[in-house]
Amino acid sequence: MEMGMSNADLCQHFYEIHKSIYSWFDCSFDHFGRTSTEHQTKIAQDIFQKLHANGYVFEQSIEQLYCEGCKKFLADRFVEGVCPHCEYEDARGDQCDRCGKLLSPTELIKPRCKSDATTPVLRTSTHLFMDLAQLSGRLEQWVDSSSVKGKWSANSISITKKWLTEGLHPRCITRDLKWGTPVPLAGFEDKVFYVWFDAPIGYLSITA
C-alpha cells in the first residue's frame, strides 16, 4: 500500500531483493522457494482439509473491525490502538510489541485504521477457528522432546511453555481478504487463510 504496488507485485519485488542479496554473498540454494506458489497452496489446503476432517476446525461468527472509509474488513496489522494489558499506545491488532501479549483487533482500546486513522466499526463475519486446546497434551510432549533435540534458545522455551501453561485458546485461521491462500471449503470461497496458518507450512512445502 505504502509503495503503491499490488500484492502480487510487492511479493515479487521483495522476492527478487532477497534472492539478489544471497547471490551477492555467493550463497546458493537447491531451491529458493516462496509461499505464493500453486505447490504451496495445494499442500496448505490439503493440511487444512485433514485438520477439518479430524475435528480440529470449527466455524464461528465473530465481530470484526470494518473501515467504512476503506470499505473493507481490516487485517490485524491494519489496526492499531491501545493495548488492554499494558496501555502501550501503538499495539497492533495481533499482538503488543511492548508486553508480548497476543491480541485480537477487537480487544484494542481506541482502535484506529492504519490507512486513514479513522475509528473502525464492528461488523459480523463467520470464520474458521483451529481448536488448539485439543492439541495441548501432544504439543507439550513435542515441546519437551524437540526443545532438547533442537537445542532451542532459553527464550523460545520459556515463551512456548508460558503459552501452554496459560492454556491454548482457539485461533481464527481465516481472513476477509483477497490476497492469500484460498480456503477450500463451501461457504468460505471469499476468504483466505490467515498468514500464520499457511506461511509456516512453507517450510515443509518447499522441501516437498
Labelled PLM ranges:
Residues G55-L128:
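Cys/His-rich short segments
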Residues M1-Q60, E68-K72, P84, Q141:
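N-terminal Rossmann-like or analogous alpha/beta NTP/dinucleotide-binding catalytic cores
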Residues G33-T35, H39-I43, C86, Q95, ...:
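Structured secondary-structure scaffolds
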